[in-house]
Amino acid sequence: MLPFWIALQFLSSLPIRLPGMPQPQELGRSLLFYPVVGVLFGVLLWALSTALMGAPLLLHAALLLTAWVLLSGGLHLDGLADSADAWLGGFGDRERTLAIMKDPRSGPIAVVTLGLVLLLKFTALVALIEQQNGAALILAPLIGRASMLALFLTTRYVRAGGLGQALSDHLPRIVGQQVLILSGLACILIGGFSGGVAVLLAAICFIGLRQLMVNRLGGTTGDTAGALLELLEVAVLVGLAL
């Protein structure tokens, strides 16, 4: 179960203590549990939404979004901000884009991007609460985290060394493909027709965003993986809310 706890520690702000430094093989296997962490997040968000039924609609959505951000510790939003700055400021140049991603400062485009993504999530949550579509609260985090597994399965990691390289090098690929298939089936089981629509929408967005990464960088980084997760989450929420 250590790979699960590694995944939960990395993807969440929950106080998880690991018994020492994980081995590279354990880091690679932790990717297999990313969709499981997504389901856990979704169940927690669904439970909170259920508890908030009867609260004013806008407050309900705001509290739900706040919990969503706090659960992940803002980790993937940080990746989205860095990627947005780098994509605009990199002017199509690979090395300049990678260098900007490592800069801890956030420029105006990062702030605007974060604002737009959070606004879209908030308004989609308002619509989904009105529709009483609780399944979307499980589907979005599940698909978002499964997309990171899919990205590492299909895309070269371009920064040598570090956590991302260990994840990429030691990911059990055949089992990873099986986990992705099971994740898709879980989405259909959870959401029915809506679950299938969410998977199709996410797949289309994934293909487009991955191609952008490959064209610019020749692969992915931790920041672009986080950006992918955030953008697929918002795509699923907005798609199901429409």
UniProtKB/Swiss-Prot annotation:
Transmembrane segment boundaries: 31-51, 52-72, 109-129, 134-154, 188-208
Annotated Pfam families: CobS
Catalysed reaction, written as an equation: alpha-ribazole + adenosylcob(III)inamide-GDP = adenosylcob(III)alamin + GMP + H(+); alpha-ribazole 5'-phosphate + adenosylcob(III)inamide-GDP = adenosylcob(III)alamin 5'-phosphate + GMP + H(+)
GO MF annotation, one: cobalamin 5'-phosphate synthase activity
GO BP terms: cobalamin biosynthetic process
GO cellular component, one term: plasma membrane
Cofactors (names): Mg(2+)
Leading EC class: transferase
InterPro entries given in the database record: CobS
Pathway(s) where this gene product acts: Cofactor biosynthesis; adenosylcobalamin biosynthesis; adenosylcobalamin from cob(II)yrinate a,c-diamide: step 7/7
EC number: 2.7.8.26
Membrane topology: Multi-pass membrane protein
Alphabetical keyword list: Cell inner membrane, Cell membrane, Cobalamin biosynthesis, Magnesium, Membrane, Transferase, Transmembrane, Transmembrane helix
Main location: membrane
Superkingdom of origin organism: Bacteria
Cellular location(s): Cell inner membrane
PANTHER family: ADENOSYLCOBINAMIDE-GDP RIBAZOLETRANSFERASE
Family: Belongs to the CobS family.
Job of this protein: Joins adenosylcobinamide-GDP and alpha-ribazole to generate adenosylcobalamin (Ado-cobalamin). Also synthesizes adenosylcobalamin 5'-phosphate from adenosylcobinamide-GDP and alpha-ribazole 5'-phosphate.
Name of this chain's protein: Adenosylcobinamide-GDP ribazoletransferase
Organism: Pseudomonas fluorescens (strain SBW25)
Gene name of the encoded protein: cobS
